[in-house]
Amino acid sequence: MRKKLWRAAALGLACVLIPSATVQAVTVNFGTAAAVATDSIQGWPAAPATVSETAVLIDADTGAVLYDKGMDEYRYPASTTKIMTLLVAVENASPRDTVTFTETGVRDVNWDSSNIGMKLGETMTMKDCWYAAIIESANEVCAQIAETVGGSEANFINMMNEKAKALGCTRTHFANAGGLPDANHYTTAHDLAKIMRAGLQNARFRKVIGAVSYTIPATNMSEARRMHTHMPLIAKESNLYYEG
């Protein structure tokens, strides 16, 4: 059952590359769906239609590409950025670490940015932060993870980009930990799949990425926060629930 959740989460996150009209540092195509390259392979099974502009399906064990819909075209990753944020965090921090929210984190608590309403001086564990970043896509939590794990946001972003290079992601550059709009923040479906594949090899990553719900205990400044996934592929109440 856990493996089904990881696969569903991987499928959803790898396909949701969000277009943006921001002036870009590279040529980022948006608004136009890519052609399915694998459909031109003789004898290869035709895949079902996807609504995403680009997509890729790879074998998690070997990395072999099974489906290619513009997999190497640049796109803005938006909150799928958090796949890398989580991976770098679980590899470089303990779930028991205490995270204290500074101006770095709370600056991203506003109406048009996904957040869980963290307050200046509020504390919770790194583990709680991981779940908030993935289940609620909390941007202020991602910023605070970055500062706490990296010593500074800038250093954590460097860690993200170095990790991307190490994984063979040649068309990816991160500018922040949450996926906020930035011309210098881009990736491809293929690179994102490589990151997800690496993450699935980490037990802590797998547990967080496949979580359907989680409760952050009461903090020094807030009551307990109950969170439930917004990813329809792993939510049983959704008509898009993937049973694997």
Regions found by a protein language model. Give the residues of each.
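Gram-positive cell-envelope targeting signals
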Residues: M1-N29
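Domain-terminus/edge residues, biased toward the C-terminal soluble/receptor-binding domains
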Residues: C169-T170, P181-G244
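Active-site-adjacent loops and short helices of periplasmic peptidoglycan-processing enzymes
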Residues: A25-H190, K194-A203
